[in-house]
Amino acid sequence: MSSEEDQPVKIEIPEPLPSPTPEQRALKRKRAIKQRLWIYGILFTVIYGGVWYQPYEVDWIPRRIPNPNPPVNPDTSRLFAKGTKVLVVTAHPDDSEFFIGGLLSQLAKSGANLHQVICTDGDKGYYFFFTNAAKNRVVRRQEARNAAKAWHAQSLKFLGYPDRFLHANDEVIAKISDEIEQFKPEYILAFDGDYPPRASHQDHRRSGDATKIAAQKTHIAKWLLLFSTIAPNYIVDITNQWEDQKNLLAIHRSQFFGSHLEGVENMVEYSAELDGTRGGFELGEGFRCIQIK
């Protein structure tokens, strides 16, 4: 007798699946293409949206610094004289303290007559994805008032444009021109729109462009001192004003606090060290001076 172990094992071979028809293959290709398009579309939207939303402009081809670029003396005896009228035009509420806090401290102590114009309310701030723009606008305006009071600004004007969308158009130029004509400054401090850092906020560049045009159009101020520039021809020694500048930065509590404040202080100090080296000082602030008349 044969046991069950001796019985042959029957292996069932499944019937081959029918080959897809040309119509089925075409439908499968269409579905795959649609899936890829969805994925590429999402990636493109995220990348393009991020590039569009971020506020910085980058000069992929570096701008050439003027050569020669000799030192310029913007009549410093008059700049630091008591009663000299100085107009400060910035893009955001914290720009003046961040970029030229040392010079402003010196001008305040010398008795200058200071007036400030802020083009946008900085309502997006540094945390624009997670901020309440309306609330931030109120907070940042108050911080700007507190800071301006600390460096003895006689007046402060908000133009009220939205953060990140400033343009050097006729309207902005006209408003800055009005401020120049009313205040009649001898000196105007503004961003350098012609020779900015390679990567810088677009509002900084546009406010600088608009201010330069307004200054040349009105032909009232004698000197235009442009900061945040890669082509400085005048360096202010701010070694003794560093503590003052740190105190000014700390006023903007909504933007600079905790470890972020320390990081911002280090960033500003590093920039001041670079400018100071150009002028032979421990710390400095660089300006590109243009004589208007």
What residues fall within each predicted segment?
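Internal, well-ordered alpha-helical segments in soluble enzyme and binding-protein domains
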Residues: 140, 172, 176, 206-211, ...
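Active-site adenylate/phosphate-handling loop in enzymes that bind or generate adenylated species
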Residues: 175-223
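Active-site rim/loop-helix segments in enzyme catalytic domains that contact anionic ligands
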Residues: 14-40, 47-183, 213, 217
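The feature marks non-catalytic terminal segments
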Residues: 5, 9-25, 29, 40-57, ...
